[in-house]
Amino acid sequence: MIEAKRVPYGVSDFLRVIRENQYYVDKTMYIPLLEAQPDNLIFIRPRRFGKSLFLSMLEAYYDCKIKDQFQEIFGGLWIGSQPTPLQGKYQVLTLDFSQVGGNIDNLEERFNSYCNICFDAFINRYAQFYDEATRKTVLAEDVASNKLATIQKYAKEHNYQLYLIIDEYDNFTNTVLNEQGEKVYHAMTHASGFYRDYFKKFKGSFAKIFMMGVSPVTLDDVTSGFNIGWHISTKPEFDKMLGFSTEDVRAMFTRYRDAGQIPADSDIEAMIEEIKPWYDNYCFSEACLNSKVRVFNCDMVLYYLRNYMDDGKAPKQMIDPNTKTDYNKMKRLLQLDKLDGNRKGIIRRITEEGSIVSNLYETFPASEIVKPEYFPSLLFYYGMLTIKDTFGDQLLLGIPNNNVRRQYYGYLQEQYQEINHINLNEFGYMLTCMAFYGKWEDVLGFMSKAYAEVASVRDGIEAERNLQGFFMAYLYLSSYY
C-alpha cells in the first residue's frame, strides 16, 4: 500500500511539510521561470492561496545554510533532478509584515522592533560568514535600518549575495488605511514616511527581492521609492503558480484513496465535480482564458479532504468556518461599511448579475480606491472577482464560485438586517419546511412582509430597486435553493 501522508492544512512551513511527510503539491517547476524574470518581483494573490508556503519553499531552495541538504529536501520534487545554478547561493532574510500587529499607536516603533528581531536572527543564522565585530555591532544596534546597513556593507565587501523575501508586505498598511484613514497612511508611505524609506533601503541592499501580498494599493504608494519592482501577478506563466489545478486535485485525492486514507470506493471524479462549483474557477490572466484550465483555492480543497478523511464523505458545510475571519478582514480592507452609493451599486450589481465589465488596473494608489472605476480591480485582487471573458478592450469579471457568492449575499444580507432584523433561525426553519413539505406560503409571506419594511426605508440601500437581490440574499441561507 502507498505510504500515508498528512494533510498540510494550515501549514506554511515548507521544511516542516517535507520532514513530517505531509502532502506537497509540487510548485518547484516555477523556480526557473521566476529566475528568468527581473530580480525584484511582486506577486499578488487572495488569502488562502498558499503564498506563505510558496515563499517558505523559495527560502529553503536558495538558503546557502542548507545547500548541502538539497537532495534530502528537494530530491522527490521536480527541481530535485534539475536544480538551477542559483540553488543555495544566498543568505536569505524573510520578513512577514503580518507580525507587525497591535494598534496604531507606536507603529513605527513596533515595526522597528520587529525588523530588529529579524535582523538579529539573520546575523545569528549566518554568523559563520561575519566577523565578531560586525556581529556585535548588529546585535548592539537599536535602530533596525542601521542593522541592515551594517549587514549590507559587510556582505557587499565580501561579495555575499542576499535574498529578501517579504510575506504580506501590505498587511499592516492596509489596516492603517482602513482604521486610521488616508492621512495617517499617506504619512507612512509617502515622502519621508518610515515604510517607504525602508523600501528605498531594500532596493540597494539585496541581490534579489520577492514580495507577496493581497492588495496592489500599498504597492503603488511605496514603489515610487522602490521603483524597480516587477509585477508578475497577471502574467500567464504564473497564473497557476499558487492554488491547485484539477490535475493537482485529482492526483491528491487518488493518492489518499490508494493509501487507504479515504474510502476505497471513493469516486474521485465525483468528488472533483462536487468541489468545483465551490472552490474552483479562478483565472488571474487574460491570456489564460483560452486554456480552460482554472485554479482551485488550495486551502478550501485541503479543508474538504481533511473532512473526507474523518467522515468518509464531504463536509456538511462546504465553506471552511475559518474563512469567516478572512471575510471580516476583507470587509475591513474593502471598507464595505463605508461604501458610497456608486460602490454599493457595484456590489449589488455583481451580486444580482454575477459579473461586471471593467478595466483591470494593475496598481492604483490609496487615494483612488474610492473611485468606482477602480473598485472592481480591488475586488479582483481580493479574490471576489475573477477573469471570465473579454468585452472589447475590457474584461468581464465574474464571481468565481459559490464560496465567494455566499460572501456577496452575506454582505447584502447584513445591509438588510441593519434596516430590518429577521430571525434567521425562524426563517431557516421555514425554508426547510418549504423544501421538504411544500409549505411555500409561509416563506413568501414572511419575505414579502420583511421586504416591504426594508423598502420603506428610503435612505437605506435603495431596497425598492433590489427585490431580486433581497430574495437571493436570504434564499441563499439554505443549501436547497
Report the location of each language-model feature.
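Substrate-engagement module of ASCE P-loop NTPases
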Residues: T150-H158, V184-I209
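Extended alpha-helical interface modules used as scaffolds for assembling large macromolecular complexes
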Residues: G229, R294-Y481
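Structural recognition of the conserved hydrophobic beta-strand(s) that form the central parallel beta-sheet
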Residues: Y163-D167, G193, A207-V214
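P-loop NTPase motor core
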Residues: G10, D26, A60-N124
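N-terminal pre-Walker A segment at the start of P-loop NTPase domains
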Residues: I2-P32, P38
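The conserved Walker
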Residues: P46-R47
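Amphipathic alpha-helical segments of the small helical/lid subdomains adjacent to P-loop NTPase cores
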Residues: T218-G225, I232-R306
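Conserved lysine of the Walker
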Residues: K51
